[in-house]
Amino acid sequence: MALSDLVLLRWLRDSRHSRKLILFIVFLALLLDNMLLTVVVPIIPSYLYSIKHEKNSTEIQTTRPELVVSTSESIFSYYNNSTVLITGNATGTLPGGQSHKATSTQHTVANTTVPSDCPSEDRDLLNENVQVGLLFASKATVQLLTNPFIGLLTNRIGYPIPMFAGFCIMFISTVMFAFSSSYAFLLIARSLQGIGSSCSSVAGMGMLASVYTDDEERGKPMGIALGGLAMGVLVGPPFGSVLYEFVGKTAPFLVLAALVLLDGAIQLFVLQPSRVQPESQKGTPLTTLLKDPYILIAAGSICFANMGIAMLEPALPIWMMETMCSRKWQLGVAFLPASISYLIGTNIFGILAHKMGRWLCALLGMVIVGISILCIPFAKNIYGLIAPNFGVGFAIGMVDSSMMPIMGYLVDLRHVSVYGSVYAIADVAFCMGYAIGPSAGGAIAKAIGFPWLMTIIGIIDIAFAPLCFFLRSPPAKEEKMAILMDHNCPIKRKMYTQNNVQSYPIGDDEESESD
């Protein structure tokens, strides 16, 4: 028993320096972050609607007896499913104290059976587009504002401490979601999640770029890490909707909180976040990176591709409740095809994109996103959403798995190979999509309708696609070109950082990979 314990401790000690274990930590952090991001998608619209109408339903029950005139009788007809009201000559009192004289008349009231899950033609439901959109956008807005600071922080103190801070904040946010019973507390929990997400995503992607220094090799681990994001998006909505309907609102968040604790324990042991590990060289200033047109094109692709699904998240469940009479569990399951296809897309094109050209992969992805989004309003039921949602997810997977590695490649090619700031920009682009998408999407859906909302974002994605052509062969800066000519190596980029890899170093079993 003691020998097995020693073997386990030795394995853990050796694994601490493994790139694969670091990849697993980033994968798990992105998985849980995006599960929390999407688990609220089917819960919040229905939960806010139920909170708002609990009071209204109580008031209706107390006022309903006043509407019945004592001299009236009702006869239900099974022939045509209608109710005939027969009233005699009498004077009754209507709500508000108004006097009303009834005569002997017959009023036929058609009985239409409307499911309780189908609040169509409800003005409150239409207005909820804006409220839900702002709630969803708050996380991305806070993350958008926090990312530049996290990028600079990682350059100064390294990646482990911000990574662990992201875990702590996400745990607090998850518990707040579980026990929040008002819109204000939900808004605070969602905003707090934005800070935690910023720490996890910027530090995580920067950490991967620093340990996988070869451009061709880097695509695969980043595709796997984005697979964690995809898994979170995949599992979140159905996981949340099923537990919400059959267990309650608190259940999905408590399960997530337990998983987040597990992630924190692994980070604490492997990354040792108490140690400050600054970068060995000074990175390119954030303002300089923001002036690079090639970085801006890559960031724009990430932003507009993800803006499509971000607009769908608050608007699609409400549109389904209004037009399809969808049940609670269906509101989350509708996103399942997009989530599955995103997972497929990131894993396939994480490897394939480098061979076919990342610019071409992103260009095709933007076009497919636009076409798929344009098809969504034509769906008449939940089955009609399968194909377009599958196309949306698959295409966004193409874009993300192409553009995330190319951000690191552009820094290697044109700037100093320090990755915190450039992945802060990538995450800012992602967050802009998720900040502008829900907030603007909710307002547009309320003003001109859901179909026009889909038309607008679909056209924007297709129009942006040709700009990806400029990423086909981005030029190197003069000093970088001199290095390339000296080493006579126009493709491999690993010489830029192979002497500056941080101390989550490569294990003995993997040193041969970097030779």
UniProtKB/Swiss-Prot annotation:
Keywords: Cell projection, Cytoplasmic vesicle, Disulfide bond, Glycoprotein, Membrane, Neurotransmitter transport, Phosphoprotein, Synapse, Transmembrane, Transmembrane helix, Transport. GO terms for cellular component: axon; axon terminus; cell body; cell projection; dendrite; dense core granule; dopaminergic synapse; neuronal cell body. Residues 1-20, 152-160, 212-220, 273-292, 354-358, 412-415, 464-515 are cytoplasmic. The gene is Slc18a2. Glycans are attached at N56, N80, N81, N89, N111. PROSITE patterns: MFS. It is found in: Cytoplasmic vesicle, Secretory vesicle, Synaptic vesicle membrane; Cytoplasmic vesicle, Secretory vesicle membrane; Cell projection, Axon; Cell projection, Dendrite. This is Synaptic vesicular amine transporter. The chain crosses the membrane at residues 21-41, 131-151, 161-181, 191-211, 221-243, 250-272, 293-312, 330-353, 359-379, 391-411, 416-436, 442-463. Pfam families: MFS_1. Belongs to the major facilitator superfamily. Vesicular transporter family. GO terms for biological process: aminergic neurotransmitter loading into synaptic vesicle; cellular response to ammonium ion; cellular response to xenobiotic stimulus; endocytic recycling; histamine secretion by mast cell; histamine uptake; insulin secretion; locomotory behavior. Strongly inhibited by reserpine and tetrabenazine. Also inhibited to a lesser extent by ketanserin and fenfluramine. Reserpine and ketanserin inhibit by blocking the substrate-binding pocket. Tetrabenazine traps SLC18A2/VMAT2 in an occluded conformation and its inhibition is specific to SLC18A2/VMAT2 but not SLC18A1/VMAT1. Interacts with SLC6A3.
